Amino acid sequence: GGTSAWSGGMIWVPNNPHMIAAGIKDSREEALTYLQSLSHDLIRPELAESFVDHGPEMVSWLEENTSVKFQLVADFPDYHPEHPGGKPTGGRSLECPLISFNDLGDNKDRVTVGYNYGTAPITMKESHLGSAVPIKVSATEHTRRAENDERGCGQALIGHLYRACLEAEIEITTSARAVELITENGRVTGVVIKKDEEELVVHARGGVILGTGGFEWNRELVRDFLRGPMTSPVSVPTNEGDGLVMCMRIGAALGNMREAWWMPAVEAPGDRGDGLNPTYL
């Protein structure tokens, strides 16, 4: 795991309550038009509608019922604002505020740290990636945050969610690899996990949500699916397509398999993909 913890930590939610509160106009129709244009009309309308309709509800529910909080990444535009329904001035991107990992107690070391953002005590809107003119953080404030182990970006997103899980007494199992989906009468009812060389069965009442990252470190899947070579992945090295493989084994339908979040990269000599050395320039 660790894809989200290594990331910039932003979530994309059209018509979210924070942009509405800031006076930024958006609508269900604009968001659906944007998604339809981006997908070249290949998107499943019912899935797009569910995402657009329930995304703002998700943000409100988390903030009202847990300690998770979000804030606008001011002026961060949609990735393709030139498409119909796109927002060139931003508003749809949210991030979690800084969080002290001391709040997680003995659990804080269970959150993996990547080399993209590390444990940097800054938010996206305070970085050059999140703003053309980032909010300046004084050296004194930066030191205070570091001493309090305050983290931003993907660490903040996972930190907020993890803290909420701990407060709700939700059990989190780490170092446990999902290896097989259990099906009964055409429905997924559980998952087999492997922990410490032992296979355990976890049954699900409502279903199984797969959040297993990508498959960019699986050379066979990259060769079979992507539209071009990927020579230098810059993500968690354990992203080997476990969820995808499990789905294919039970005959799940696949779609949009040729694309990735492409970016130019130059692999640094001696890189081991574990964050000990920079992996791209």
Where are these regions (language model features)?
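Acidic-leg catalytic submotif of subtilisin-like serine proteases
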Residues: 66
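Active-site rim elements
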Residues: 44-49, 234
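Flexible glycine/proline-enriched surface loops and loop-helix/loop-strand junctions
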Residues: 34-45, 227-230
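Residues forming the flavin
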Residues: 1-31, 70-74, 79-281
